[in-house]
């Protein structure tokens, strides 16, 4: 649910979290750093016990209509929490009722508060593209000149300068930044995304969107984040050549999958073992695109050959999980951390091994620990990240 809120936050829409009163701070002040200095229209529905028992959705529709009259949003998006999911709230029906009542484009997405942020943000992005992106003025060209940045939200990049650095890298290399999904851009600019020559998938939240734009407008996609000097140069070259095989080995023709499919799997406790019990130099824990980018950086820039990847997000797009272990069970993650000489992860993971805290390199992830470690978040995009990581690897237990 907070994936929807983050992906749509800056775009002028009315975002409604269908949950109990007081839960707004969970989605905003804890997980959304833009809340403090960026205008927004994120509301909580104030779901109460009697409406839950009686299935009274009319109050929700009435309240949304009243808010629309007061705030004049461009669209309405409604996401669910565990309780509406448990009672079987029909979000598609609410979507139709709200659209008919307000005359605005409306998204009703059955998030459940159980899965991660990836399906919600991914579904919201695809809906945005289907609803607002206009037909292109010309076909994609090679070498690429116009770039869409997809999946750029504080959940994966925070607001410490990663987004600004990323955009600077793109424009300094001679590219035109067509649109940024969805930090520092407007809904009108996102509507021109079909004019791009290449899409960059910066996080798993955007993989569904990249596939949709490929199938609809023929725009190829590249998966990855520029990390380090060599990583940045290789990333820019992949953009110019529209090289979908960069980092992933993809052909660019991977079958389109829907974000809703991830929500259909209710087994959140998964383990797909990928490694044996032998020790390794470095274990990296996080979101799949970040993991693939970090592995390339550690191997090619710092010469570390034995790098393992662990993704705790079992609902990530399956195409992105093929080169890593998937584990959301705490004991399994603890065992993998124990095998590694160094662990690069959100600092909360250090609590799994209280006697081995020196082996952990802190890389806070806003989607995991929220605002708790915001002050420690580094700029991990671009050439300057090399010096930062070298220093961290030499601290503690070293390598």
Predicted features along the sequence, with ranges:
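An N-terminal assembly and electron-transfer interface module characteristic of large anaerobic redox
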Residues: 1-399
